[in-house]
Amino acid sequence: MGSIEVAERTTVGLAAKDPSGILTPYTYTLRNTGPDDVYIKIHYCGVCHSDLHQIKNDLGMSNYPMVPGHEVVGEVLEVGSNVTRFKVGEIVGVGLLVGCCKSCRACDSEIEQYCNKKIWSYNDVYTDGKITQGGFAESTVVEQKFVVKIPEGLAPEQVAPLLCAGVTVYSPLSHFGLKTPGLRGGILGLGGVGHMGVKVAKAFGHHVTVISSSDKKKKEALEDLGADSYLVSSDTVGMQEAADSLDYIIDTVPVGHPLEPYLSLLKIDGKLILMGVINTPLQFVTPMVMLGRKSITGSFVGSVKETEEMLEFWKEKGLSSMIEIVTMDYINKAFERLEKNDVRYRFVVDVKGSKFED
């Protein structure tokens, strides 16, 4: 169907107004549905650790007011005249990006997350010159290219964290050829992304070792998530015994930390895959890499194509996210708890079931 002609479309969300990171109601305008756009009523939105970085200006790039949230699941209310992949009433997803140049090597290769002109779903400037706002809001308008199809049968609240955390671990395992059953993988850090790493790696048939700074999460890692073993990084004997045992490590730690203890765990040709957003330099001595032909690499979320592939995989394997559902009136408390790592393992905001007041 074509665009509905309205003078101005507004929506209300929860926005950070300054680096305190406190979210309060904020009304703003949305563009009308263009020919390639999808107008979405938001039902759920996941809470990511990078949202915390953004609302508090930890990376020094925040612009206010800012409506965060980039793990969006909602219902299609309207589609533009050129939209063929989606129809009114469908449940769809939107991840971290809402724009790209569509002409560079990354875009031509369908890995638009590496486009140098990508447009973030919030805290960025869209092609019309307006500031993008995220998923802690009643509704949004997104170009169809960046809208994700969700397989029937997946619960929408379960899907939300997959749109960032889920594809963040799926993408590098797929790209680096680490989907083969029988591989031995390590998951460093057991937070929102880490718990997804355990689930995805186990679904690929890998032997999974969770690596953490203490044994506080040992029981849940082994019993709740199904990890095969658990390593405490300060356990010198245990770390020595595990040397040269892993094909890869997914490093999800979002703060500065030494790399050398974990490089020693890798086999020859093993990969340490960095995923945490860290704004301080990481250090290591080169022989730790050279003497095993090991690689330190990184990966950044995933493309729309990879996300849809991951969702089909998730459905096929019958996996589920471990989430805590909250409403908008709890969001500031949720961020406080997230900052203390007090969540198992991902907050998901029930936007549809929340009340907004401005």
Swiss-Prot record:
It catalyses: (E)-cinnamyl alcohol + NADP(+) = (E)-cinnamaldehyde + NADPH + H(+); (E)-coniferol + NADP(+) = (E)-coniferaldehyde + NADPH + H(+); (E)-sinapyl alcohol + NADP(+) = (E)-sinapaldehyde + NADPH + H(+); (E)-4-coumaroyl alcohol + NADP(+) = (E)-4-coumaraldehyde + NADPH + H(+). GO terms for molecular function: cinnamyl-alcohol dehydrogenase activity; zinc ion binding. Zn(2+) 1 binds at C48, H70, E71, C164. The keyword Oxidoreductase applies. Binds 2 Zn(2+) ions per subunit. One of its GO terms (biological process) is lignin biosynthetic process. Its cofactor is Zn(2+). Its EC number is 1.1.1.195. Homodimer. Involved in lignin biosynthesis. Catalyzes the final step specific for the production of lignin monomers. Catalyzes the NADPH-dependent reduction of coniferaldehyde, 5-hydroxyconiferaldehyde, sinapaldehyde, 4-coumaraldehyde and caffeyl aldehyde to their respective alcohols. Can use coumaraldehyde and, with a lower efficiency, coniferaldehyde and sinapaldehyde as substrates. This is Cinnamyl alcohol dehydrogenase 1. The lineage of its organism: Eukaryota, Viridiplantae, Streptophyta, Embryophyta, Tracheophyta.
